[in-house]
Amino acid sequence: MVMEDNESCASRVIFDALPTSQATMDRRERIKMEVFDEVLRRLRQSDIEDAHLPGFEDDLWNHFNRLPARYALDVNVERAEDVLMHKRLLHSAYDPQNRPAIEVHLVQVQPAGISADLDSTSNDAGHSSPTRKSIHPPPAFGSSPNLEALALAASLSQDEDADNSVHNNSLYSRPLHEITFSTEDKPKLLFQLTALLAELGLNIQEAHAFSTTDGYSLDVFVVDGWPYEETERLRISLEKEAAKIELQSQSWPMQQSFSPEKENGQTGARTHVPIPNDGTDVWEINLKHLKFGHKIASGSYGDLYKGTYCSQEVAIKVLKPERLDSDLEKEFAQEVFIMRKVRHKNVVQFIGACTKPPHLCIVTEFMPGGSVYDYLHKQKGVFKLPTLFKVAIDICKGMSYLHQNNIIHRDLKAANLLMDENEVVKVADFGVARVKAQTGVMTAETGTYRWMAPEVIEHKPYDHKADVFSYGIVLWELLTGKLPYEYMTPLQAAVGVVQKGLRPTIPKNTHPKLAELLERLWEHDSTQRPDFSEIIEQLQEIAKEVGEEGEEKKKSSTGLGGGIFAALRRSTTHH
């Protein structure tokens, strides 16, 4: 999961002479060393026995090194003992019997701008008003401005209601719970953990997720919603719920219908990943005709190559054998199952797949233009206005086709939109797509937080309108060229979307009808979002109006005429 670190003005001045990437790297390493030294000093001063053992300093440094630099940047050095707890949990997670290792603490967030040292006071009736002095430690990773502001609002509300209620249950007066998980890193882990918390009625107020260099995770959530000011019952409840999720993850709901061996009563090792076949299509790739070229991209669970199949240029997505498990196989099977029947000019064309472990791969048409995400955020490209509308409508047409065939994509984002040499955009990556249930609603959670609909984040039932919300975020990306919620981590953005109604800021110069459409696309109530067929009509209408305005004004020679979004003008030119 991508997380962002923001430089201070001072650090940019100090490293002004260095290349940006080198300056950022040096800054992070320097801060990591400073944090390590401070944590070590505090642990030794607190007379923690382990801190004085031979080799402890090296062990602590190894702990910082196996986690991303962001861990050192975010951790609260005043809670040095929490670093030891994180180290212990990660060590405990080595044993499969201990997974997930769980720790629960009571924490208290200090409202921004209010002193933590104010004593409790008495009102005229002789009752003691709630004290503002924290009786519990702060969260291990401090707190975001949003969480501090939330605590401040609750504290002020508490002041207003003090005369009417002695036992005020505001966020500030009632401590929060900080829950730390450590387990083996795997696909969809965050979704499982957030689903676990939701099942217990817990509301996530703050979240931090870290992956170690050796394949483990450290996930920290600050939550409210537990009715008791204690930790043991909550920990036991979490362990019970985690056991249920672990059992569910070991099963494959569609295995029975997918597996001919099981239907025939056969047992033994599978020779291929079972995928439904109605006998009308042949999609198993003959590896003799598949030629690999250079690697295009690499991820945690697979690599993407350019190649040829029977002399046709293709893209080959290969799953890494060492990362294969039932979850990844299920995702692979689902992608093949859906893509083999999809035929549309705005959906990436499936050519075939190899389903014989350990060489699992999916072969599709090659898209030389790359992804919309790379074009916008890495190449700093700009779509000229007519092209922007064309791209937006292309995506709509592809998604409308999928929805007409009862397919919900569930992970619509700029990285999953690919361009050919003619700037035709096609929807790709169906690894987490699903055929809509007959009931019309679904409850499995996946996708990427920055683009995810609130009902999916909250693990509530959802339908095809979840894709419409994601499309709204993509359309905003096309207009601005910016990453959604770029100054927040993905988890912080998710909390903001659900609990505070957070949405990307629509630039002031946006055409009024387009601004209105964006707001409809990311409505919290999914029933208020339009279908893709309606979106296509509205975009075509807006494009026509903007074109007419441009013709009348005759002021733009760049194709970015002043009707819709003057802020689209950037120094980078389209190529």
Curated annotation (Swiss-Prot):
Binding of ATP, residues: 296-304, 317
Residue numbers spanned by region Disordered: 116-140
Subcellular location: Cytoplasm, Cytosol
Organism: Arabidopsis thaliana (Mouse-ear cress)
High-level lineage: Eukaryota, Viridiplantae, Streptophyta, Embryophyta, Tracheophyta
Active-site positions on this chain: 411 (proton acceptor)
GO biological processes: cellular response to hypoxia; chloroplast organization; protein phosphorylation; response to abscisic acid
One GO cellular component term: cytosol
Enzyme Commission identifier(s): 2.7.11.1
Protein's name according to its UniProt entry: Serine/threonine-protein kinase STY46
Record InterPro entries: ACT-like_dom_sf, ACT_dom, Kinase-like_dom_sf, Prot_kinase_dom, Ser-Thr/Tyr_kinase_cat_dom, Ser/Thr_kinase_AS, Ser/Thr_Kinases-Pseudokinases
Post-translational modification comment from the UniProt entry: Autophosphorylated on serine and threonine residues. Autophosphorylated at Thr-443.
Underlying gene: STY46
